[in-house]
A protein has these predicted regions:
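Secondary-structure junction motif
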Residues: 14-27, 57
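A ligand-binding cleft/hinge motif common to bilobed small-molecule-binding domains
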Residues: 53-73
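Short helices/loops that flank or line small-molecule/ion binding pockets
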Residues: 28-29, 39-59
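Short helix-loop capping/hinge motifs at secondary-structure junctions, enriched
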Residues: 1-4, 34, 95-101
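A conserved helix-loop-strand patch within extracytoplasmic ligand-binding domains
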Residues: 1-19
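Periplasmic-binding protein-like
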Residues: 68-104, 109-123, 126-150, 157-162
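Short beta-strand-to-loop elements that line the ligand-binding cleft
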Residues: 15-16, 31-41
């Protein structure tokens, strides 16, 4: 409950998987990171090798349920939410321009007709509702890993908890 800002968050260490891109992101924001194999992170949290194990909205509830028998003392914090832009990209061979154009055209049509959002909410809505954003303090972290061409200004491409 005492974590209100990024400066407050920097007083804690986070656990992350070896080689995860999030490691660089947290370190670039001045947050101490302990890396380990994913399968060891829950046990390491139990033994206080680090303070926090940030998980994505699409991961936290499933993992919590799966790991709760082995880690009964673990809780999901209900006060804060760490947020940073994290895109998912489609990569295609530069030799397949037809596929590139077809994917881009299809995604643009989906954004325009609302089917992109419908699919997003179909697969993520339950977890997003369970997070209960209105009762959480959102701590924004910069994602310095993003290419300069990342369309951060195109709000229809991003989910942001403040817009929820």
């Amino acid at each position: 409950k005492n974590v209100r800002t990024l400066a407050d968050l920097k007083k804690f260490s986070v656990g992350q998987g070896v080689g995860w891109d999030d490691v660089k992101l947290y370190e670039a924001n001045g947050i101490s990171v302990v890396e380990a194999k994913y399968s060891n992170l829950f046990r390491m949290l139990h033994y206080q090798r680090f303070d926090l194990f940030p998980r994505g909205i699409n991961e936290i509830f499933t993992e919590f349920e799966k790991e709760s028998a082995q880690n009964p003392d673990r809780v999901i914090d209900e006060n804060i939410l760490i947020h940073y832009p994290w895109p998912y990209y489609f990569f295609v061979s530069k030799n397949n321009q037809a596929l590139h154009k077809r994917l881009e055209s299809g995604l643009k049509k989906m954004l325009k007709d609302g089917s992109f959002d419908a699919i997003f909410w179909k697969y993520n809505g339950k977890a997003i509702e369970a997070v209960n954003f209105k009762n959480r303090r959102i701590i924004e972290i910069q994602n310095y890993l993003l290419p300069k061409a990342t369309p951060l200004h195109h709000s229809s491409l991003w989910f942001h908890p403040k817009m929820k």
